[in-house]
């Protein structure tokens, strides 16, 4: 769990996302509160529940991007899911408890990665010895092994092909369901896992070059040094105390006014979400998981429905409301120039791989922003995503001919931009064909 202060979290988000100060503050405080809770004594820690967040704002203003960046910062089990993927319990499809099961798998992956780093040195040596066995045989003299070890570490043998024995996974094995426990839940049992445990794991030979063999063997040797049961227990503890779930597109499961009758992927899903967000115990194949202290961040554009169309109980379980503002022309210019991996920097770097030096002038950036604003206002406002469309249109010819123009310098100015997009942006009928 990261111990960044709210100010540090906001400044980290500022590097990638323009504006939306309120949303950044809300998620920063929520993330810091996870750390604060861990500092309390056991009795009080149980009582402190997370304040779940509902982010409301039009499409393309940064809701999903905030979640993506937060996942990297959190250092905790983090899962982003779309609410539209789920159906009510009892119907064909995924039920919402699958969210917790997926979160546990994420947690296990995180903990395993951390444990592998702890045993990296021992595993590295064991993997190196197995590669040497494949190269010179287990019975080779120490002098021969040392000579080959030096060459191996120098990278001289990277392209040499060797045959190694690796653990055979159960990917090709059939799955079967326990009656009454559908496959979307924990009832899908992998026969490969069961047989592997019963017979101590199977291995199969693989022919790969030395460079590819080392990572495969490193992971295998690291796993031998790790207590797998301890990983699962630690992961469940991490998920229960630090887990974060980002529920995107929650507006799509809101009931709409004037609709009648059951809707298994709308109100039914909301009803199923209630106990999950409030706090319940979910059965997983690794054991029961409590959701009382998992932080839920829900987001939606609410174009057609309103937040008040959600079930009142669900609204009550999302106490912190944050509204994100629509982006302006000035925001578009900042997105193109100030963010760490801006679209302009990406385009210049991509053209650089072809040997083309691309220069996009300041007035070109402003012209791209103008075109995006104009098309958004004439057709459909899809926020910052429109910038990708405009840039692709501007650089379309160059992207196609770049391999033939290696060594050239191409300057894109405002006139160049307008000549490519102005007609389409001005004509509302035609601009409907800009996706």
UniProtKB/Swiss-Prot annotation:
Could you mention a single GO BP entry for this protein?
Answer: protein unfolding
**Where does this protein reside within or beyond the cell?**
Cytoplasm
Name the domain of life. Answer: Bacteria
| GO molecular function per UniProt | ATP binding; ATP hydrolysis activity; peptidase activity; proteasome-activating activity
Using the UniProt record, give the first listed, main subcellular location: cytoplasm
Cellular component terms per the entry's GO annotation: HslUV protease complex
Question: Which Pfam families is this protein grouped with?
Answer: AAA, AAA_2
List of residues binding ATP: 18, 60-65, 248, 313, 385
The record's annotation in Gene3D superfamilies points to:
1.10.8.60, DNA helicase RuvA subunit, C-terminal domain, P-loop containing nucleotide triphosphate hydrolases
Arranged from A to Z, the UniProt key words for this protein are: ATP-binding, Chaperone, Cytoplasm, Nucleotide-binding, Stress response
User: What functional role does this protein have?
Assistant: ATPase subunit of a proteasome-like degradation complex; this subunit has chaperone activity. The binding of ATP and its subsequent hydrolysis by HslU are essential for unfolding of protein substrates subsequently hydrolyzed by HslV. HslU recognizes the N-terminal part of its protein substrates and unfolds these before they are guided to HslV for hydrolysis.
Q: What PANTHER family does UniProt report for this protein, alphabetically?
A: ATP-DEPENDENT CLP PROTEASE ATP-BINDING SUBUNIT CLPX-LIKE, MITOCHONDRIAL-RELATED, ATP-DEPENDENT PROTEASE ATPASE SUBUNIT HSLU
The UniProt subunit note reads as follows: A double ring-shaped homohexamer of HslV is capped on each side by a ring-shaped HslU homohexamer. The assembly of the HslU/HslV complex is dependent on binding of ATP.
The similarity comment for this entry is: Belongs to the ClpX chaperone family. HslU subfamily.
Q: Which HAMAP family match?
A: HslU
Protein's name in the database: ATP-dependent protease ATPase subunit HslU
Species this chain originates from: Xanthobacter autotrophicus (strain ATCC BAA-1158 / Py2)
